[in-house]
């Protein structure tokens, strides 16, 4: 859905790093190198970006109030 603002485990702010992370991946960084460049060293913070599935664009196509 939408990337969480803070890490669920340690509380570090990670919400502002999503777009930068995608930019690193577009410029052919590996996932690990991109996370290192963002300063995410803890496993808990790294998994927040690695495991995120961005579904917001797909959900915007649905209009539950229309029949």
Curated annotation (Swiss-Prot):
Keyword ATP-binding assigned: no
Residues annotated for Zn(2+) binding in this entry: 7, 10, 44-45
GO biological process terms, semicolon-separated: transcription by RNA polymerase I; transcription by RNA polymerase II; tRNA transcription by RNA polymerase III
Main subcellular location: nucleus
InterPro entries: RNA_pol_su_RPB10, RNA_pol_suN_Zn-BS, RPABC5/Rpb10
Subcellular location: Nucleus
Protein function: DNA-dependent RNA polymerase catalyzes the transcription of DNA into RNA using the four ribonucleoside triphosphates as substrates. Common component of RNA polymerases I, II and III which synthesize ribosomal RNA precursors, mRNA precursors and many functional non-coding RNAs, and a small RNAs, such as 5S rRNA and tRNAs, respectively. Pol II is the central component of the basal RNA polymerase II transcription machinery. Pols are composed of mobile elements that move relative to each other. In Pol II, RBP10 is part of the core element with the central large cleft.
Record's protein name: DNA-directed RNA polymerases I, II, and III subunit RPABC5
